[in-house]
């Protein structure tokens, strides 16, 4: 019997079923984040749509086995013409390569040449943190733009967690209702990307912001319920916080780079600027590789040179 995926994606039944099996294996065996799974599903769907036009018919496992590097290059060129940047192209190719490797391991195709293609080189861009003063203004409860007091307190609490603990926005919004309920707690355990856990210290300012939100929130914040709620009581979505950050940018005169994630960058950069070591910051951020954390040394050096140029008498 035909499955939904056979109708929803432009592929023959054998390839559609194999792709569905691959997506399930990513979730259960590799435990990738929901965002990565969504991206891989979307990227491989776009790839199959491209192949349908490229080949003149929906591809099957046979066509996948006959793929050449030139076909993948054509796919990337097509995406680039649609406005995709190097980072998007790299992620898209990563999803396609992961699917091809899965099919090879299952003995369904032999696409070793195509699966070995390297991603486009991405230009290295430094994170853009806020200044310490701007970060404090953003997380201040008094500076929030929401009219309802409990929503203003909620926004301040979320933003304080991003800056005060270095959380990803998905990690903050994934907290349970009983999180940070003990005002004497010095730390909490966060489950991040790849289901990896890490210990995050809790500052008094973080406890204070969450406590103010708890006191004003009209919804049940017990264990098993989400800590942060939308206006109607459902789980709070990241888009709401991103929209509030847009209002703060306009109200406080901040640059477009002042996003919720920039608060996490600010957490790392300000720690490094005050003498924090890279290994500790790596653990606090939940980075799997130290090389990911090392980008913040470039930010700190850049700031040091800016201060030097402005203040040194011989500059």
UniProtKB/Swiss-Prot annotation:
Q: Name one GO biological process term.
A: cell division
Asked whether the keyword Cell cycle is assigned, the reply is: yes
Database matches in InterPro entries: CB, DNA_brk_join_enz, Integrase-like_cat_sf, Integrase_catalytic, Integrase_recombinase_N, Integrase_SAM-like_N, Tyrosine_recombinase_XerC/XerD, Tyrosine_recombinase_XerCD
GO CC entries: cytoplasm
| GO MF | DNA binding; tyrosine-based site-specific recombinase activity
Q: Does the keyword Cell division apply?
A: yes
Q: Which UniProt keywords apply?
A: Cell cycle, Cell division, Chromosome partition, Cytoplasm, DNA integration, DNA recombination, DNA-binding
* Tyr recombinase domain mapped to chain residues: 125-309
Q: Where in the cell is it found?
A: Cytoplasm
- Superkingdom of the organism of origin: Bacteria
Identify the SUPFAM superfamilies for this entry: DNA breaking-rejoining enzymes
Which parts of the sequence belong to the Core-binding (CB) domain?
13-104
Q: Where is the active site?
A: 168, 193, 261, 264, 287, 296 (o-(3'-phospho-dna)-tyrosine intermediate)
**Protein family according to the UniProt entry:** Belongs to the 'phage' integrase family. XerC subfamily.
Q: State the protein's purpose.
A: Site-specific tyrosine recombinase, which acts by catalyzing the cutting and rejoining of the recombining DNA molecules. The XerC-XerD complex is essential to convert dimers of the bacterial chromosome into monomers to permit their segregation at cell division. It also contributes to the segregational stability of plasmids.
Assembly notes: Forms a cyclic heterotetrameric complex composed of two molecules of XerC and two molecules of XerD.
Name of protein:
Tyrosine recombinase XerC
Q: Which gene encodes it?
A: xerC
């Amino acid at each position: 019997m035909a499955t939904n995926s056979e109708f929803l994606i432009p592929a023959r039944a054998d390839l559609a079923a194999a792709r569905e099996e691959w997506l399930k294996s990513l979730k259960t065996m590799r435990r990738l984040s929901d965002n990565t799974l969504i991206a891989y599903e979307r990227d491989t769907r776009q790839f199959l749509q491209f192949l349908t036009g490229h080949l003149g018919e929906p591809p099957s496992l046979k066509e996948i086995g006959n793929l050449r590097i030139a076909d993948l290059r054509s796919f990337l060129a097509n995406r680039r013409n649609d406005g995709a940047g190097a980072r998007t192209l790299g992620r898209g190719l990563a999803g396609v390569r992961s699917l091809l490797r899965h099919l090879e391991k299952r003995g369904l195709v032999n696409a070793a040449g195509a699966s070995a293609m390297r991603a486009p080189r991405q230009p290295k861009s430094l994170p853009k943190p806020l200044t310490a003063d701007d970060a404090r203004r953003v997380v201040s409860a008094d500076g929030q733009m929401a009219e309802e007091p409990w929503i203003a307190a909620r926004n301040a609490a979320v933003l304080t967690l991003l800056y005060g603990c270095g959380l990803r926005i998905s990690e903050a919004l994934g907290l349970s209702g009983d999180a940070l309920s003990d005002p004497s707690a010095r730390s909490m355990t966060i489950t991040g990307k790849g289901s990896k856990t890490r210990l995050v210290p809790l500052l008094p300012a973080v406890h204070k912001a969450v406590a103010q939100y708890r006191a004003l929130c009209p919804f049940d914040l017990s264990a098993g319920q989400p800590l942060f709620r939308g206006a109607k009581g459902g789980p709070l979505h990241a888009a709401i916080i991103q929209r509030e950050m847009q209002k703060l940018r306009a109200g406080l005169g901040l640059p477009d780079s002042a996003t919720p994630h920039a608060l996490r960058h600010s957490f790392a950069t300000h720690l490094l600027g005050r003498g924090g070591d890279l290994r500790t910051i790596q653990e606090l951020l939940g980075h799997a590789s130290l090389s990911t954390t090392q980008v913040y040394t470039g930010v700190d050096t850049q700031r040091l040179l800016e201060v030097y140029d402005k203040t040194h008498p011989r500059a």
